Amino acid sequence: MSARLEVEILTLFPRMCEGYLAESILGKAREAGIVSVSVSDVREHARGKHRVADDAPYGGGAGMVMKPEPLTEAIEAARARLPGALVALTSPRGARLDQALARRLATHGRLVLVCGRYEGVDERVLAAVDMEVSIGDFVLTGGELAALCVVDAAARLVPGVLGNEASAGAESFAGEDTLLEYPQYTRPPDFRGMKVPEVLLSGDHRRIERWRRREALRVTRERRPDLLERARLTENDLRLIDAGDDEL
Protein backbone atom coordinates (compact mmCIF):
# COMPACT_ATOMS: atom_id res chain seq x y z
CA MET A 1 0.00 0.00 0.00
CA SER A 2 1.42 3.38 -0.96
CA ALA A 3 1.35 6.10 1.68
CA ARG A 4 -1.60 8.49 1.58
CA LEU A 5 0.61 11.38 2.71
CA GLU A 6 4.26 11.67 1.70
CA VAL A 7 6.43 14.33 3.33
CA GLU A 8 10.09 15.23 3.13
CA ILE A 9 11.57 17.68 5.64
CA LEU A 10 14.68 19.63 4.63
CA THR A 11 16.72 20.81 7.61
CA LEU A 12 20.22 21.50 8.88
CA PHE A 13 19.43 19.46 12.01
CA PRO A 14 17.74 16.14 11.10
CA ARG A 15 17.92 14.70 14.61
CA MET A 16 15.65 17.47 15.88
CA CYS A 17 12.83 15.97 13.82
CA GLU A 18 13.50 12.24 13.89
CA GLY A 19 12.64 11.64 17.55
CA TYR A 20 9.22 13.26 17.36
CA LEU A 21 8.34 11.51 14.09
CA ALA A 22 9.05 8.09 15.59
CA GLU A 23 6.59 8.38 18.48
CA SER A 24 2.85 8.17 19.14
CA ILE A 25 0.30 8.51 16.34
CA LEU A 26 2.81 9.66 13.72
CA GLY A 27 5.17 6.81 14.50
CA LYS A 28 2.37 4.25 14.20
CA ALA A 29 1.11 5.80 10.96
CA ARG A 30 4.61 5.59 9.49
CA GLU A 31 4.99 1.97 10.59
CA ALA A 32 1.63 1.15 9.00
CA GLY A 33 2.67 2.81 5.74
CA ILE A 34 -0.21 5.30 5.85
CA VAL A 35 2.12 8.28 6.19
CA SER A 36 5.67 8.51 4.89
CA VAL A 37 7.99 11.15 6.37
CA SER A 38 11.68 11.41 5.52
CA VAL A 39 14.20 13.93 6.83
CA SER A 40 17.05 15.18 4.64
CA ASP A 41 20.13 17.15 5.65
CA VAL A 42 20.54 20.34 3.62
CA ARG A 43 24.30 20.21 4.29
CA GLU A 44 24.58 17.29 1.87
CA HIS A 45 24.22 19.88 -0.88
CA ALA A 46 26.67 22.38 0.63
CA ARG A 47 30.08 23.03 -0.93
CA GLY A 48 33.55 22.62 0.48
CA LYS A 49 35.22 20.55 3.14
CA HIS A 50 33.13 21.98 5.98
CA ARG A 51 29.75 21.87 4.19
CA VAL A 52 28.95 25.47 5.11
CA ALA A 53 25.26 26.25 4.50
CA ASP A 54 25.08 29.81 5.85
CA ASP A 55 26.90 33.12 5.43
CA ALA A 56 26.85 36.74 6.62
CA PRO A 57 24.09 38.96 5.19
CA TYR A 58 24.89 41.49 2.49
CA GLY A 59 24.51 45.02 3.84
CA GLY A 60 25.60 43.97 7.32
CA GLY A 61 23.52 43.08 10.33
CA ALA A 62 23.38 40.46 13.03
CA GLY A 63 23.18 36.73 12.46
CA MET A 64 23.66 34.48 9.47
CA VAL A 65 21.57 33.74 6.40
CA MET A 66 21.03 30.31 4.80
CA LYS A 67 22.83 30.19 1.45
CA PRO A 68 20.77 29.79 -1.74
CA GLU A 69 22.82 27.05 -3.46
CA PRO A 70 22.51 24.16 -0.97
CA LEU A 71 18.92 24.97 -0.06
CA THR A 72 17.72 25.30 -3.65
CA GLU A 73 19.52 22.12 -4.68
CA ALA A 74 18.04 20.27 -1.71
CA ILE A 75 14.57 21.40 -2.80
CA GLU A 76 15.20 20.31 -6.38
CA ALA A 77 16.37 16.89 -5.22
CA ALA A 78 13.29 16.53 -3.01
CA ARG A 79 11.01 17.47 -5.92
CA ALA A 80 12.67 14.73 -7.98
CA ARG A 81 11.94 12.20 -5.22
CA LEU A 82 8.36 13.44 -4.74
CA PRO A 83 7.02 14.54 -8.14
CA GLY A 84 4.17 17.00 -7.86
CA ALA A 85 4.93 17.85 -4.23
CA LEU A 86 3.93 21.20 -2.76
CA VAL A 87 7.03 22.90 -1.35
CA ALA A 88 6.47 25.05 1.75
CA LEU A 89 9.06 27.13 3.59
CA THR A 90 8.53 27.71 7.30
CA SER A 91 8.63 31.47 7.77
CA PRO A 92 7.03 34.15 9.99
CA ARG A 93 5.97 35.85 6.74
CA GLY A 94 3.95 32.82 5.67
CA ALA A 95 0.28 31.91 5.65
CA ARG A 96 -0.93 31.13 9.16
CA LEU A 97 -1.36 27.41 9.76
CA ASP A 98 -4.94 26.62 10.69
CA GLN A 99 -7.22 23.63 10.29
CA ALA A 100 -8.28 24.66 6.79
CA LEU A 101 -4.67 24.90 5.61
CA ALA A 102 -3.81 21.61 7.32
CA ARG A 103 -6.67 19.98 5.42
CA ARG A 104 -5.47 21.49 2.15
CA LEU A 105 -1.96 20.17 2.73
CA ALA A 106 -3.21 16.72 3.71
CA THR A 107 -5.36 16.59 0.59
CA HIS A 108 -2.42 17.53 -1.64
CA GLY A 109 -0.76 14.29 -0.60
CA ARG A 110 2.89 15.19 -1.21
CA LEU A 111 4.76 17.88 0.72
CA VAL A 112 8.30 19.16 0.99
CA LEU A 113 8.82 21.26 4.12
CA VAL A 114 11.85 23.55 4.18
CA CYS A 115 13.04 24.58 7.64
CA GLY A 116 14.34 28.12 7.92
CA ARG A 117 17.20 28.92 10.32
CA TYR A 118 19.27 31.78 11.71
CA GLU A 119 18.16 35.17 10.36
CA GLY A 120 16.27 33.46 7.54
CA VAL A 121 16.98 32.18 4.05
CA ASP A 122 18.39 33.99 1.05
CA GLU A 123 15.42 35.62 -0.71
CA ARG A 124 16.33 33.89 -3.97
CA VAL A 125 15.38 30.54 -2.47
CA LEU A 126 11.74 31.63 -2.71
CA ALA A 127 11.88 31.05 -6.46
CA ALA A 128 12.06 27.32 -5.67
CA VAL A 129 9.15 27.14 -3.20
CA ASP A 130 5.38 27.23 -3.65
CA MET A 131 4.37 28.89 -0.40
CA GLU A 132 5.50 30.02 3.03
CA VAL A 133 3.86 28.75 6.24
CA SER A 134 3.85 30.28 9.73
CA ILE A 135 2.57 28.78 12.98
CA GLY A 136 2.14 32.10 14.77
CA ASP A 137 3.41 35.56 15.58
CA PHE A 138 6.42 34.57 17.65
CA VAL A 139 10.08 33.78 17.04
CA LEU A 140 11.62 30.29 17.11
CA THR A 141 15.26 29.30 16.78
CA GLY A 142 14.48 27.41 13.60
CA GLY A 143 11.70 26.03 11.45
CA GLU A 144 11.91 22.42 12.63
CA LEU A 145 9.17 22.79 15.25
CA ALA A 146 6.96 24.54 12.72
CA ALA A 147 7.53 21.77 10.17
CA LEU A 148 6.61 19.14 12.75
CA CYS A 149 3.43 21.07 13.55
CA VAL A 150 2.52 21.02 9.87
CA VAL A 151 3.18 17.28 9.57
CA ASP A 152 1.22 16.47 12.72
CA ALA A 153 -1.78 18.62 11.81
CA ALA A 154 -1.94 17.29 8.25
CA ALA A 155 -1.32 13.64 9.14
CA ARG A 156 -4.21 13.54 11.63
CA LEU A 157 -6.58 14.30 8.76
CA VAL A 158 -5.41 11.36 6.66
CA PRO A 159 -7.89 8.44 6.78
CA GLY A 160 -6.56 5.60 8.90
CA VAL A 161 -4.11 7.66 10.97
CA LEU A 162 -6.38 8.07 14.01
CA GLY A 163 -7.71 4.96 15.67
CA ASN A 164 -11.20 6.48 15.82
CA GLU A 165 -12.08 8.40 12.67
CA ALA A 166 -14.64 10.40 14.67
CA SER A 167 -11.85 11.85 16.82
CA ALA A 168 -10.64 14.34 14.23
CA GLY A 169 -14.15 15.59 13.57
CA ALA A 170 -14.84 16.32 17.23
CA GLU A 171 -11.67 18.26 17.99
CA SER A 172 -11.25 22.01 18.21
CA PHE A 173 -11.37 23.77 14.82
CA ALA A 174 -12.61 20.61 13.09
CA GLY A 175 -15.47 20.76 10.62
CA GLU A 176 -17.02 24.01 9.47
CA ASP A 177 -18.25 25.64 12.69
CA THR A 178 -14.72 26.23 14.10
CA LEU A 179 -15.78 25.75 17.74
CA LEU A 180 -13.32 24.77 20.45
CA GLU A 181 -13.72 21.25 21.75
CA TYR A 182 -15.96 20.44 24.73
CA PRO A 183 -14.34 19.46 28.08
CA GLN A 184 -13.19 15.86 28.42
CA TYR A 185 -13.34 13.61 31.51
CA THR A 186 -12.20 10.10 32.38
CA ARG A 187 -11.99 7.93 35.53
CA PRO A 188 -12.22 8.44 38.47
CA PRO A 189 -15.67 10.03 38.67
CA ASP A 190 -14.62 12.08 41.72
CA PHE A 191 -11.10 13.56 41.93
CA ARG A 192 -10.38 15.68 45.02
CA GLY A 193 -13.99 16.75 45.20
CA MET A 194 -14.20 17.63 41.50
CA LYS A 195 -16.91 15.46 40.01
CA VAL A 196 -17.59 14.41 36.44
CA PRO A 197 -20.81 16.09 35.23
CA GLU A 198 -23.78 13.84 35.94
CA VAL A 199 -24.98 13.94 32.36
CA LEU A 200 -21.83 12.14 31.16
CA LEU A 201 -22.59 9.25 33.53
CA SER A 202 -26.25 9.04 32.57
CA GLY A 203 -25.91 6.83 29.51
CA ASP A 204 -28.39 9.10 27.72
CA HIS A 205 -26.56 9.71 24.43
CA ARG A 206 -28.93 12.44 23.30
CA ARG A 207 -28.37 14.45 26.49
CA ILE A 208 -24.62 13.84 26.27
CA GLU A 209 -24.46 15.18 22.72
CA ARG A 210 -26.47 18.25 23.70
CA TRP A 211 -24.21 18.82 26.73
CA ARG A 212 -21.09 18.54 24.59
CA ARG A 213 -22.47 20.97 22.05
CA ARG A 214 -23.44 23.45 24.77
CA GLU A 215 -20.03 23.19 26.41
CA ALA A 216 -18.24 23.69 23.09
CA LEU A 217 -20.30 26.84 22.57
CA ARG A 218 -19.64 28.04 26.13
CA VAL A 219 -15.88 27.44 26.01
CA THR A 220 -15.60 29.12 22.63
CA ARG A 221 -17.58 32.15 23.81
CA GLU A 222 -15.37 32.51 26.89
CA ARG A 223 -11.97 31.90 25.31
CA ARG A 224 -12.24 32.59 21.58
CA PRO A 225 -15.30 34.77 20.91
CA ASP A 226 -13.86 35.59 17.49
CA LEU A 227 -14.42 31.98 16.48
CA LEU A 228 -18.01 32.08 17.69
CA GLU A 229 -18.67 35.09 15.48
CA ARG A 230 -17.59 33.06 12.44
CA ALA A 231 -19.33 29.84 13.42
CA ARG A 232 -22.41 28.57 11.63
CA LEU A 233 -24.83 28.52 14.55
CA THR A 234 -28.33 27.11 14.41
CA GLU A 235 -31.35 28.32 16.38
CA ASN A 236 -30.87 25.32 18.63
CA ASP A 237 -27.26 26.40 19.29
CA LEU A 238 -28.45 29.83 20.37
CA ARG A 239 -30.87 28.22 22.82
CA LEU A 240 -28.22 25.82 24.13
CA ILE A 241 -25.63 28.48 24.95
CA ASP A 242 -27.37 29.51 28.17
CA ALA A 243 -29.29 26.29 28.85
CA GLY A 244 -28.96 24.62 32.24
CA ASP A 245 -28.31 20.89 32.70
CA ASP A 246 -31.98 20.30 33.47
CA GLU A 247 -32.87 21.76 30.07
CA LEU A 248 -30.73 19.33 28.07
UniProtKB/Swiss-Prot annotation:
GO molecular function terms listed in the Swiss-Prot or TrEMBL record: tRNA (guanine(37)-N1)-methyltransferase activity
Domain of life where this protein originates: Bacteria
Alphabetical UniProt keywords: Cytoplasm, Methyltransferase, S-adenosyl-L-methionine, Transferase, tRNA processing
Protein name: tRNA (guanine-N(1)-)-methyltransferase
Function per UniProt: Specifically methylates guanosine-37 in various tRNAs.
Protein EC: 2.1.1.228
Pfam families: tRNA_m1G_MT
Record localization: Cytoplasm
The family this protein is said to belong to: Belongs to the RNA methyltransferase TrmD family.
CDD domains named among the record's database cross-references: TrmD-like
First-listed, main subcellular location of the protein, grouped into a coarse class: cytoplasm
Record text on subunit structure and interactions: Homodimer.
InterPro entries named in the record: Alpha/beta_knot_MTases (IPR029028), tRNA_m1G_MeTrfase_C_sf (IPR023148), tRNA_m1G_MeTrfase_TrmD (IPR002649), tRNA_m1G_MTases_N (IPR029026), tRNA_MeTrfase_TRMD/TRM10 (IPR016009)
Any Gene Ontology CC annotation: cytosol
